[in-house]
């Protein structure tokens, strides 16, 4: 059992399951639980109210519904006793200010290789493309006719398993049976 501050709205676990981030907009903070030690590890104070957390292989991306910035927390730094550094990167110029945020819609998603993320800024009608380690967007997509309220990426690529010449992908089959793969 671990106590976190009042006002927590969501919690997300990193891909390895070591760290659980508890989003607390009222406190303008993210509480980080160390599951290996079964205790609250630290509280990361933020300048803006956090609303969502997404994990790449290197960073936790913290989205703020009321800010034009993203906060990044380096996962490998969490095991150190010192405070985890928070990187602030721009997400456009205009602040979303929560006006267009809808429950159930995630305003960001991981890239298929987990080396970055895409993030929607509905006020600017832009989806920004981030690569881990960069301090600004790598690119952007303008959605001229509509406000991007959420982002979902579908990965339909093949990946080579090592250098074996064997490729693999993940698919979903609706029914059991025998399938011919051309």
Q: What is each residue range found by the language model?
A:
Residues 1-182:
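Predominantly soluble domains enriched in secretory-pathway, periplasmic, or organellar proteins
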């Amino acid at each position: 059992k671990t106590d976190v501050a009042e006002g927590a709205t969501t919690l997300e676990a990193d891909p390895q399951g070591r760290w659980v981030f508890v989003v607390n907009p009222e406190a303008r903070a993210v509480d980080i639980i160390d599951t290996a030690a079964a205790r609250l590890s630290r509280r990361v104070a933020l300048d803006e109210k956090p609303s969502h957390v997404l994990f790449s292989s290197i960073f936790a991306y913290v989205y703020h519904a009321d800010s034009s910035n993203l906060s990044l927390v380096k996962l490998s730094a969490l095991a150190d006793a010192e405070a985890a550094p928070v990187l602030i990167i721009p997400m456009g110029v205009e602040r979303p200010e929560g006006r267009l945020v809808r429950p159930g819609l995630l305003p960001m998603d991981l890239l298929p290789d987990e080396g970055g993320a895409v993030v929607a800024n509905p006020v600017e009608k832009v989806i920004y493309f981030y690569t881990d380690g960069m301090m600004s967007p790598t690119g952007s997509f303008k959605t001229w006719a509509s406000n991007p309220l959420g982002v979902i990426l579908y990965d339909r690529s093949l990946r080579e398993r090592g250098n074996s010449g064997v490729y693999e992908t993940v698919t979903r089959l609706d029914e059991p049976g025998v399938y011919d793969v051309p």
